Amino acid sequence: MTAPDADGPWLTDEQQSVWRVFLAVQSLLPVALDAQLSREAGLSHSSYIVLALLSEAPDRSLRMSQLAQSVTMSPSRVSHAVARLEERGLVRRERASDDGRGNRAILTDQGMEELVAAAPGHSAEVKDLVFGGLTPEQLTQLGDVLSVMESRLRTRQANRVAPGRSGGNRRVT
């Protein structure tokens, strides 16, 4: 068997090696971040991200659909995450006032306090696990590589066709 062609359907040995490292990081990093946040703040990483996104939004509020898009979770998964945060008093839900059709998730003062308390430990863990040991040049390269990947993924996602409410198809934007 000959070596895979860079333009052929199979990954080259180098691509396969990089892909496996990427998969390992993609698997190990969320587990490590979840463990740190759970241990120190009683939060999952996805809950932390929801709180952080709400803290950065105008009026600390986002429509549930916007929140789902921002965290790249399914609407039902976001709804469950928000329900758990709501039970703890960290978030509340209200009917969207602009059209009354959807719900908004709103970060409470208690939620903001818990986010602020959790942030230093989370930031330290991210600095250690993601950026620790990288030179300034490697950090720049990592940012460049991830930006290219994100752009390609977002373009692909935006170009997918989703079923429309009327039974036809529409472009997802």
Which stretches of residues belong to each language-model region?
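N-terminal leader segment of winged-helix/HTH proteins
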Residues: 1-41, 172-173
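Residues in the helix-turn-helix
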Residues: 77
